[in-house]
From Swiss-Prot:
The lineage of its organism: Eukaryota, Metazoa, Chordata, Craniata, Vertebrata. The active site is at 158 (proton acceptor). Its main location: nucleus. Belongs to the protein kinase superfamily. Ser/Thr protein kinase family. PANTHER family: SERINE/THREONINE-PROTEIN KINASE KIST, SERINE_THREONINE-PROTEIN KINASE KIST. GO terms for cellular component: axon; cytoplasm; dendrite cytoplasm; neuronal ribonucleoprotein granule; nucleoplasm; nucleus. This is Serine/threonine-protein kinase Kist. ATP binds at residues 29-37, 54. The gene is Uhmk1. Residues 23-303 form the Protein kinase domain. The keyword 4Fe-4S does not apply. The keyword ATP-binding applies. SUPFAM superfamilies: Protein kinase-like (PK-like), RNA-binding domain, RBD.
Amino acid sequence: MAGSGCAWGAEPPRFLEAFGRLWQVQSRLGSGSSASVYRVRCCGTPGSPPGALKQFLPPGTTGAAASAAEYGFRKERAALEQLQGHRNIVTLYGVFTIHFSPNVPSRCLLLELLDVSVSELLLYSSHQGCSMWMIQHCARDVLEALAFLHHEGYVHADLKPRNILWSAENECFKLIDFGLSFKEGNQDVKYIQTDGYRAPEAELQNCLAQAGLQSDTECTSAVDLWSLGIILLEMFSGMKLKHTVRSQEWKANSSAIIDHIFASKAVVNAAIPAYHLRDLIKSMLHDDPGRRIPAEMALCSPFFSIPFAPHIEDLVMLPTPVLRLLNVLDDDYLENEDEYEDVVEDVKEECQKYGPVVSLLVPKENPGRGQVFVEYANAGDSKAAQKLLTGRMFDGKFVVATFYPLSAYKRGYLYQTLL
């Protein structure tokens, strides 16, 4: 969908018009060499979810930078328009152009607004690593996305933690940033991938390009599997591996280094069966791209058959439309029907201050005994409630508010959360 052009000064205005609607620019989310991303919300449509405005070619950009921005815009637009509809790929709402002056157009993509990135999750879990539940969730979602885009003939070519984001509404991880993507067999990008997540064949190709030499072969979808293997190893270890994967020790025997990482973690938590994850990661990190496991085959790994449960930290970090309140009801309330109904009504009334409540559940038996599960109409209301209810006093006790997987809640599956 293309929108009409509109005037925009050097600084982002509070409002802009696109697609026949007025949009409020609320804040800048981030910026790079060729684009900036802003949080925007459609005015006059109460309850509409916010969006992400990716603006290419910021004011003052000229020359090679301007060409790179235009190229990145065209690449990302083409890829997203062809790959639309997959739940693990960011949704493109539309495309429009802003004119800072008659000769300086700024291309814009309006995208769905996502939540926390894997990069942020790695910072939170530094040194201790992510839970197996989170690693499994992320691995499955990214592999589903890769299997789809590889089937469509695309290579993402810049898979890294910052480009994998959580969707609170869809309760899954999604891929973003297709500015370096290309059609397999038609690699029109010389320099691909980010340092630390770059496959050996891409590293060689980049070195040759810097020397002004042409590579004999093009990179394939296997480069994406290498990047994912490094990301999963970082999530498991809690360590950045940029220097490790560039070391001579890694090049000599990466398998032994992976074994050492898993062995050291096994000492900390021997109860977790991690060998299936280890084998999956190894299958993604063969130096020979021809031996690397394809995404579709990786989804058949026995690692995905293990029913891991989330840690409480996972349910704090990953927003969903469902809120779980702890430390609210004790046994006295649960065993007295009148008091139980009164306190449940009080809790519901308090929760409705943050948005429409679809359902509310307070189990009287385990699992979940005494916990309050609140399903909101959308994740935005749930996030607002979680932020404001955490630490509140209720009947003399501090409330602890976490999120809870909507899919599990709908099935009546109440996890025994790991602490």
